[in-house]
């Protein structure tokens, strides 16, 4: 399952069936989080352009509000932006987010995932994450991806739930 628009000029996004590139990112409490530490359960990687921006806030709050339902799929949500951990801490506290928000402040992870948005709105030269979703299976393989070149477009949350449901039934 894939709904991908125009690929990044930096590197190509990984394909469905590929192993998700590992990362080691700081959370809002400055604790390092490795993707590989979460193997053994489905993961929803939710990359977003900027903390506290309107669409990003709506998206992360939608994940917050549906977390109990997602736990029914034994899924872990990880939000990832290029914002620093201190900004992500304020975002997490202001929005009462109940899942880790990770900081890709050096932009290495968005480059490895091929989801660099080279100019965020009028901020020429400010590289942010394209709004993107990767659903990973228990082994860390990508089973669903969605990437948007338009930062104003939210993901289809039903597609994400359907991808998780497929993982649960195939387990």
Which role does the model predict for each range below?
Residues 1-171:
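Chalcogenol-based redox active-site neighborhoods
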């Amino acid at each position: 399952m894939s709904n991908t628009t125009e690929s990044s000029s930096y590197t190509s996004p990984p394909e469905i069936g590929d192993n998700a590139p590992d990362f080691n990112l700081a959370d809002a409490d400055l604790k390092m989080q490795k993707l590989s530490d979460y193997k053994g359960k489905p993961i929803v990687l939710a990359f977003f352009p900027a903390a506290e921006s309107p669409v990003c806030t709506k998206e992360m709050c939608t994940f917050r509000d549906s977390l109990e339902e997602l736990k029914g799929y034994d899924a872990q949500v990880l939000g990832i932006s290029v914002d620093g951990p201190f900004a992500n801490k304020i975002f997490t506290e202001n929005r009462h987010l109940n899942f880790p928000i990770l900081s890709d402040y050096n932009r290495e992870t968005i480059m490895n995932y091929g989801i660099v948005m080279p100019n965020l709105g009028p901020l020429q030269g400010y590289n942010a994450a394209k709004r993107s979703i990767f659903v990973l299976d228990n082994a860390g393989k990508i089973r669903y991806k969605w990437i948007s070149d338009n930062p104003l477009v939210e993901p289809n949350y039903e597609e994400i739930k359907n991808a998780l449901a497929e993982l649960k039934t195939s387990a």
